[in-house]
Amino acid sequence: MAKLSTDELLDAFKEMTLLELSDFVKKFEETFEVTAAAPVAVAAAGAAPAGAAVEAAEEQSEFDVILEAAGDKKIGVIKVVREIVSGLGLKEAKDLVDGAPKPLLEKVAKEAADEAKAKLEAAGATVTVK
């Protein structure tokens, strides 16, 4: 088997859709028994003062946009999902909306997350930003 260079791997990833990359990451995590999630410090209940929790929330710089439900205007939500998530075809966007709750965007800036949430809610979807 030929060894691929880093540039060749990146070129292959650029050609993949978001769903294909997500499946790849899951299989990679399972194969090598690792996780791509950032480590999170878990404090015991009541151990940290309330002010510390507020400071931690203010320091958060990456947010996930999660589609909770499509609502009554499913077609409009599908159109917005295609607009927000680059590289999605109509079928992939429909599958994503049908499979709610699903993350649409991961580790994006607060402004991008808020903008996506506003567009989705305007289309009739229920969305959370974490």
Swiss-Prot record:
Subunit structure: Homodimer. Part of the ribosomal stalk of the 50S ribosomal subunit. Forms a multimeric L10(L12)X complex, where L10 forms an elongated spine to which 2 to 4 L12 dimers bind in a sequential fashion. Binds GTP-bound translation factors.
Keyword tags: Ribonucleoprotein, Ribosomal protein
Entry's family note: Belongs to the bacterial ribosomal protein bL12 family.
Further details from the record: Was identified as a high-confidence drug target.
Any single GO BP term: translation
General function of this protein: Forms part of the ribosomal stalk which helps the ribosome interact with GTP-bound translation factors. Is thus essential for accurate translation.
Entry GO terms, CC: cytosol; cytosolic large ribosomal subunit; peptidoglycan-based cell wall; plasma membrane
Keyword Ribonucleoprotein: yes
GO MF entry, a single one: structural constituent of ribosome
Classification via SUPFAM superfamilies: ClpS-like, Ribosomal protein L7/12, oligomerisation (N-terminal) domain
Name of the protein this chain belongs to: Large ribosomal subunit protein bL12
One protein family per Pfam: Ribosomal_L12
Organism annotation: Mycobacterium tuberculosis (strain ATCC 25618 / H37Rv)
